Amino acid sequence: MAAGALLAGAVSVVAPQTVSAAPVCPGAGQAPVLVGRVPGAALEGVAVDGGGRLYTTDLLSGRVFRLDAPGAPAVPVATVPDGGAGALAWASDGSLLVGYGADARVFLGDILRPGAIAKLNTATNVLSPFVSGLSAANGLDVAADGTAYATNDFGTQIGRVFPDGRVEPHWATLPSANGAVLGADDRYLYVSRTFVNPGVSRIPLANPGAPESILDLAGLDNFAAPDGLALDSRGRPVVPANVRGEIWRLDSPGQYCVLASGLPTSSMVVYGQGSGGFSAGRLFRIGFDGAIYEIPGGFDG
């Protein structure tokens, strides 16, 4: 969420004082475990490769970092050519898509369309521009056919990018769509709604004009600022509540519980991959505090 740089100063004071409206998830509630840090960074995007290596982006410097395992140092591997670095997602050709152009222009993203995507060859660390002309690339995911979807939490337009580089900047309309994750069957694109009518929606790829809300927040949680989400192996959305400082799991429409707390400025969550490093089944959180935490209560074994 590009808003993180604006929220971070206030959130660290406010979030610990709030009382959650949601119960702790069964078997969860353990303290988060610090597993990595990028000093001075505001971490925005995250992805894990098949070998368990974690990649993350810095909204401020535009750099992409790699951590080979929990506890390992963050190694800068690339810098985007314009603006802050945003979302990450794996392309069908094995390259890592890197969203960029995440700066003040996103406030007028639907008009200016500053959002762009580059491709990172993770074997050589060569970053090559791919497409531009999106409202933003704050959230990003790729379907099995290679089509990518990109969101802007300060706009209304969700873009679609075809494998050949064609861009459809206004594929769908949903105010303040944030994050992006496709269901296992590519039927739905799941997004958080951060600032406008906060909650979580899913958008049918076959009918993008008919988004379905699966969570509408109310009361104090209306100000929780849900951010970049993931899906567990059962297809349940796992959502960081940025201002709340909590990680939520949505068990059914309208019903959510708390996996972890005490994590203000959380920007995104991701499940690990592979058998080593940031391994499969383990849930990790990044944030605008530059820290990476494991969420033990979110283990998906």
What residue ranges belong to the model's regions?
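Secretory targeting and sorting signals
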Residues: 1-21
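Short loop/turn segments that connect beta-strands within beta-propeller blades
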Residues: 67-72, 120-125, 161-166, 204-209, ...
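Beta-rich, blade/repeat-based domains predominating
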Residues: 36-53, 80-105, 111-116, 131-149, ...
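N-terminal low-complexity, Pro/Thr/Ser-rich intrinsically disordered segments
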Residues: 19-35
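A short loop-to-beta-strand structural motif that recurs across blades of beta-propeller domains
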Residues: 63-66, 115-118, 157-160, 199-201, ...
